[in-house]
Design a protein with these regions (language model features):
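An N-terminal assembly and electron-transfer interface module characteristic of large anaerobic redox
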Residues: 1-187
């Protein structure tokens, strides 16, 4: 089958995980495009409040884009906790918008029901490989009858891929910082 992944909020940051996870389970992954004014306008009618941050408002357009491409299944989980990236950090909570914005989408986008899209947004903790894997095993057994052993294997590969992607980004960041230092240029 096909799974739609909206390129929004923490889904963007954790995309290496989700892409690998779903490919390992045999899904074809369709990622919404980069954010733009056109994407924003696609979902503007379903935004329930002007007080939401712009990145959250963009989520409506990304979901609409996927729906307009007849994606039968969209995955956008609620993630209250991320990995603790810095030892000694006081917390590793996501902001309330990131934590549960897919609930807002589910309750304000009638297109999901009208087009009979399976919108899966379970609450999950991204705190560790073991915790996330166990939660995914339960969800995908219940929703798709995928054996827990298959989901566990896919989750392991996905966790390793995310770790490698983060290492690659860190390495590139160090290269850029060294370049700026060597050339006397400035960067943000």
């Amino acid at each position: 089958g096909v799974v739609g992944i909206p390129r929004v909020l923490n889904m963007y940051e954790n995309f290496p995980y989700w892409a690998t996870f779903f490919k390992e389970l045999g899904f074809r992954v369709m990622l919404s495009p980069q954010s733009s004014h056109q994407i924003y306008e696609l979902g503007i009618e379903t935004i329930p409040s002007e007080s939401e941050c712009y990145p959250a408002k963009l989520a409506h357009g990304h979901i609409s884009w996927l729906i307009k491409r007849d994606v039968p299944f969209i995955f956008y989980p609620c993630i209250p906790y991320e990995r603790k990236e810095v030892p000694g950090a006081g917390n590793h909570y996501n902001c309330p918008m990131v934590t549960s914005y897919s609930e807002n989408i589910k309750n304000n986008m009638e297109e999901l029901k009208e087009k009979n899209v399976k919108f899966l947004n379970p609450f999950m903790a991204f705190t560790s490989e073991a915790v996330l894997s166990k939660q995914l095993q339960e969800v995908f057994k219940k929703e798709f009858d995928i054996p827990e052993s298959e989901t566990k294997k896919a989750a392991k590969k996905a966790w390793d891929e995310l770790a490698q992607a983060r290492t690659d980004v860190e390495k590139k960041g160090e290269e850029v910082l060294q370049y700026l230092k060597d050339t006397g240029k400035h960067g943000i």
